C-alpha cells in the first residue's frame, strides 16, 4: 500500500506533464483584414463591383473587417496513424464603429484521421464541417471550385499515377419544397437540403513541373419525406472541372476549364440549388491565373477569365474579367503594388453591358519579399470608373435595362466614377 501511495504523486506529475504538452500543442491559424478608408466625394470608403460580376478586384477595395480564427490539435497519434480536430469561426463587420457586434459563423468543425486504413496508406478519412480542397483566385477573392460544408469523405488515396478523393457535402436553400397541409393549401419547408457528391483525381503528371487535376460534382435537392419541389425546379445538376498547374518563375500558373448544368449553375462553384426554378441551363468557364516572384525585385499576380451562363429563364450573363497586380520590392519588407482590373458583364435578357475599370496604387510593408508575405500594412488610393446599362429589378429580380442612368429601379449603378483612399492590414498565419 505504501509503495502504491508513493507512486501516486509521480503518476500525477507525469499525467500533468502530458496534459501540459497536449495543451501547448494547440495549433492557432487564421486570416484577418481590417482598416479605414475615405471616399473622395465624402463619407466612408465605398467599394466597387460590376453589377452581375461574382467578384471584384480586392486591393484597396475591401470595406469590411473580416476574420477567420482556427483552433486545431492532433488528439491522438500512434505510429503513422493520427486523429486531428480542426475548427474555424468567422466574423465580418462593417468597420464603421468601435463596438460592432455580429453573430459568428461556425465554418469548420471536423476530425481528420490519417492512415487509418492499412491498405490505403497516406489516405485521410474525415467527417464534419470543412473547407474542402477549395480552389480560388486570390486577387479577386473568387472561389471557382468550393463544395465546403458539413460532410464526410476519403481523400488522397494513392493510385500510383495520381491521388483520388471522394466526398459528400451539404448546403441548404430557404424554402424550395412544400407539402399540402390541406387539400389546397401549400405548406413550405423552412429549408431544403442540397447534397453534392464529389470525385477528384489530382497529381497527374503531364509535363516537367506540370500536374493535372480532374473532378466531377453531382448536386441534387433532397426534400424531406412528403415534400415536393416546385414545378420546373432544376432538381439536380453536374459540374466538371479540369485544372492544369504549372510551376514557373518562382510561382505557378493555373489553367482551368469548367462546365456546369442546371442546379449547379447558381453559384457556379460546386454548390447545388436544386429547388430553384430559374437555373435550368448551363455554364462554361475558362480561367487562367497565377502568382510569381520573378526575383528579389519583382513579383506578379494576374487573372483572365471568360464565363458564360446560358439559362432557360434568360437571366444568365456573360462575364469577362482581366487584371494584373505587379509588385516592386524596394527592400525585403517594403513594396509598391499596382492593381489594374477590368470587368464586363453582358445580360442574356437585355443584351446590354455593364463594365468597370478599377486601378489601385498601394505602398506596403510586409513580413518578407514574396507576393504572399503577410502580415502586411498598406496605404492605398483607388480609382474606379463604371458604365452600367442593366441591373436586377428591385421587384422581380429579373434582368432589366436601366434607362434612368442612376439605378433608380434596378441594381444598376449608371455611369459614374469615384476615388477612395485609406489604410489596411491583412494577415494570415
From Swiss-Prot:
Positions of region (Disordered): 397-416
UniProt record, GO biological process: monoatomic ion transport
UniProt site positions, description: Important in sugar transport: 143
CDD domains: Maltoporin-like
Catalyzed reactions: beta-maltose(in) = beta-maltose(out)
UniProt-annotated site: Greasy slide, important in sugar transport, residues: 31, 66, 99, 252, 372, 428
Name of the protein described by the UniProt record: Maltoporin 2
Amino acid at each position: 500500500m505504501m509503495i502504491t501511495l508513493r507512486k501516486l504523486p509521480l503518476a500525477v506529475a507525469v499525467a500533468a506533464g502530458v496534459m501540459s504538452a497536449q495543451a501547448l500543442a494547440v495549433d492557432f491559424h487564421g486570416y484577418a483584414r481590417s482598416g479605414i478608408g475615405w471616399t473622395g466625394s465624402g463619407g466612408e470608403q465605398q467599394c466597387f463591383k460590376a453589377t452581375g460580376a461574382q467578384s471584384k478586384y480586392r486591393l484597396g477595395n475591401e470595406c469590411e473587417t473580416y476574420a477567420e480564427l482556427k483552433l486545431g490539435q492532433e488528439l491522438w497519434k500512434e505510429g503513422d496513424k493520427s486523429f486531428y480536430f480542426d475548427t474555424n469561426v468567422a466574423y465580418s463587420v462593417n468597420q464603421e464603429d468601435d463596438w460592432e457586434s455580429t453573430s459568428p459563423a461556425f465554418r469548420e468543425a471536423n476530425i481528420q484521421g490519417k492512415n487509418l486504413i492499412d491498405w490505403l496508406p497516406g489516405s485521410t478519412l474525415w467527417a464534419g464541417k470543412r473547407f474542402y480542397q477549395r480552389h480560388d483566385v486570390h486577387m479577386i477573392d473568387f472561389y471557382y471550385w468550393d463544395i465546403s460544408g458539413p460532410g464526410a469523405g476519403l481523400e488522397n488515396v494513392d493510385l500510383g499515377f495520381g491521388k483520388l478523393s471522394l466526398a459528400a457535402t451539404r448546403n441548404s436553400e430557404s424554402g424550395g419544397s412544400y407539402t399540402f397541409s390541406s387539400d389546397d393549401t401549400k405548406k413550405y419547408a423552412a429549408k431544403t437540403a442540397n447534397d453534392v457528391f464529389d470525385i477528384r483525381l489530382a497529381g497527374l503528371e503531364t509535363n516537367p513541373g506540370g500536374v493535372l487535376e480532374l473532378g466531377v460534382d453531382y448536386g441534387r435537392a433532397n426534400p424531406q419525406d412528403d415534400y415536393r419541389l416546385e414545378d420546373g425546379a432544376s432538381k439536380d445538376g453536374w459540374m466538371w472541372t479540369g485544372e492544369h498547374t504549372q510551376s514557373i518563375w518562382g510561382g505557378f500558373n493555373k489553367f482551368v476549364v469548367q462546365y456546369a448544368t442546371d442546379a449547379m449553375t447558381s453559384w457556379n462553384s460546386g454548390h447545388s440549388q436544386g429547388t430553384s426554378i430559374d437555373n435550368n441551363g448551363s455554364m462554361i468557364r475558362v480561367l487562367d491565373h497565377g502568382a510569381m516572384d520573378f526575383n528579389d525585385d519583382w513579383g506578379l499576380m494576374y487573372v483572365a477569365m471568360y464565363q458564360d451562363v446560358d439559362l432557360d429563364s434568360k437571366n444568365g450573363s456573360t462575364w469577362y474579367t482581366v487584371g494584373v497586380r505587379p509588385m516592386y520590392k524596394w527592400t525585403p519588407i517594403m513594396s509598391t503594388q499596382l492593381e489594374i482590373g477590368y470587368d464586363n458583364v453582358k445580360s442574356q435578357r437585355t443584351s446590354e453591358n455593364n463594365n468597370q475599370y478599377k486601378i489601385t496604387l498601394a505602398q506596403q510593408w510586409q513580413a518578407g519579399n514574396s507576393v504572399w508575405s503577410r502580415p502586411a500594412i498598406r496605404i492605398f488610393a483607388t480609382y474606379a470608373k463604371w458604365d452600367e446599362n442593366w441591373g436586377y429589378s428591385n421587384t422581380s429580380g429579373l434582368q432589366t435595362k436601366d434607362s434612368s442612368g442612376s439605378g433608380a429601379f434596378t441594381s444598376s449603378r449608371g455611369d459614374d466614377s469615384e476615388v477612395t483612399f485609406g489604410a489596411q492590414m491583412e494577415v494570415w498565419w
